[in-house]
Swiss-Prot record:
Biased composition annotated in UniProt, kind: Basic and acidic residues: 347-360
Gene Ontology MF term list: chromatin binding
Note in the entry: Some orthopoxviruses such as cowpox, ectromelia, and raccoonpox viruses, form large cytoplasmic inclusions within which mature virions are embedded by a process called occlusion. In those viruses, A26 bridges mature virion with inclusion bodies through interactions with proteins A25 and A27 on the mature virion membrane. In camelpox virus, the protein A25 is deleted in its C-terminal region and no inclusion body is observed.
PANTHER family: STRUCTURAL MAINTENANCE OF CHROMOSOMES PROTEIN 2
Name by which UniProt lists this protein: A-type inclusion protein A25 homolog
Amino acid sequence: MELTNLIEKCTKHSKDFATEVEKLWNDELSSESGLSRKTRNVIRNILRDITKSLTTDKKSKCFCILERSTINGEQIKDVYKTIFNNGVDVESRINTTGKYVLFTVMTYAAAELRLIKSDEIFALLSRFFNMICDIHRKYGCGNMFVGIPAALIVLLEIDHINKLFSVFSTRYDAKAYLYTEYFLFLNINHYLLSGSDLFINVAYGAVSFSSPISVPDYIMEALTFKACDHIMKSGDLIYIYAFTKKVKDLFNTKSDSIYQYVRLHEMSYDGVSEDTDDDDEVFAILNLSIDSSVDRYRNRVLLLTPEVASLRKEYSEAEPDYKYLMDEEVSAYDKHLPKPITNTGIEEPHATGGDKEDQPIKVVYPPNNDKDDAIKPHNPLEDPNYVPTITRTDIGIADYQLVINKLIEWLDKCEEECGNGGEFKTELEEAKRKLTELNAELSDKLSKIMSLERDSVNKTERIDRLTKEIKELRDIQNGTDDGSDSSEIDKKIIRELRESLDREREMRSKLEKELDTIRDGKVDGSCQRELELRRMWLKQRDDDLRAEIDKRRNVEWELSRLRRDIKECDKYKEDLDKAKATISNYVSRISTLESEIAKYQQDRDTLSVVRRELEEERRRVKDLESRLDECTRNQEDTQEVDALRSRIRELENKLTDCIESGGGNLTEISRLQSRISDLERQLNECRGNVTEISRLESRISDLERQLNDCRRNNETNAETERDATS
């Protein structure tokens, strides 16, 4: 692409981007928010231009054009600085769809232009995606998504991608479903690609991307690839389809649509569609050659995003959907071939009042000046340069076998999930039986078609051979001048040959009609009627299955909700049981501590009482000792007193040991108290003895006094008598 053309495209795409953002500027973010296919294509176009400009000598030109575009009269550069505000309170400032789109696109574009080191890109994207998570958590806009362009992805290591994936996988409250799916795809794709020789490669400019599995449209949009880019595939991949365009919405709704696709027969394509800016452009890769167990995106519900983004399904809730039969196969675009002429001046069948959809399209070919060819009816199959224009669904007969296999696989899966005794067991068995019968009939029809084609080839060869013989006979006839019998014989042979040729032509015409009926024609034939009946039956079964799937989805949704409630209740019950066990442990420990405290308190009170009693007893013992000492001084026989004193000292030592040990045996204390009582009794007895001794001593003293008085009186009397006698 020349630079001038790139700058012109960038100018147009920047204007389209500014117009789209301005239109969405006041749409508040919510759980129903999502980007339409038109908006996603506008974003892809401007990011592609910036990516392509990186390989030119004016790589900042496209980015400057984008920055100078205006939104509501203000340049995008200034608007971006205002809503970004240096990363302060971003989730409150970016509250509409338009601001969200502007914020993401400008961040990616600036990163593409200014960053080339993987660590720098990773650091920027880490901060950026944390802001995105904050926005999604605040507004619950789970269907909003603008993925990383391929120009940045190719610079990141797998470790960086896994770390960015963890930003979303650990932020459960962010509701960034599509970002999580995007990084999950990159992770799965990396490990599958590293261990496989199978690949599908898409490239434009300086970027390329390879994958061995199906690639959904929103992944291709995020990576900024289009169906006009260079596509390559490995030779082992046979059933590869590239979806290129949305034809119309199905059943007048936007929940599903009919798409055009190209089957990739060749290993390399310089684009399979024209490079346009149409709003209904689509690009997705369907790979039916790889094992379905490793390809989670071949399901049509996941491969092609509905127009209303909030109606898209997640992998966990997506039912098997392979309605590829409704989509239209078209030929790959070749820029070297002239475009077909659509205005021929010939009145089309629908112009006469017929239905355009039901009328066969007539192809008008340029007249040939050759006289012989002019009088012959033109047979397109004999024209080697004939390229048919397909106006409705054209699926190879062999692909019906693939679809039937998928339907049987789907029914087997439904039967496994519903169980052997499920409600729909009979319907499933009936559907499988009819599919098996249809498969057998289809195989029979295929064999008949192949036989007819072989017969057609044989008849064609025979016709060519007879034509050659007729021409030789004509030459012989024209070369004879006489009227011999050989001329009559030759005429007869020619007539017979012509009759045989007419019969062969008639047979060939019938065969061609039958083949046209099988492929795409409207000629009534047995095979056509059978196929129409089978299609009607398949559609009816599809409707029935869809209704049952809706019922099942509702039941599963309710069951899932109940399971979540039960799981939460179980979790709360488990937490409650743990709390009860913890409380019980604490109560037990508190009771133990209270009993120990009470015991210690009782022991302390008892010890205090015992100490007081011991102090009192000590004082009493000391008093007894003092009295015993006094008694000892007043009594000559001190043997019993010494025994009591030693016994008291012994008791005192025991009491002292008891006090020093911080307590004592209450029984021993009681015994000691009783012993002390005995000692007190003995002491009292001793006291009684001392009193008696004192009384006796006083009596002795009195008697001694009387004796002394008596002695003195006797001495006095004796002296008196002696004096008297002398």
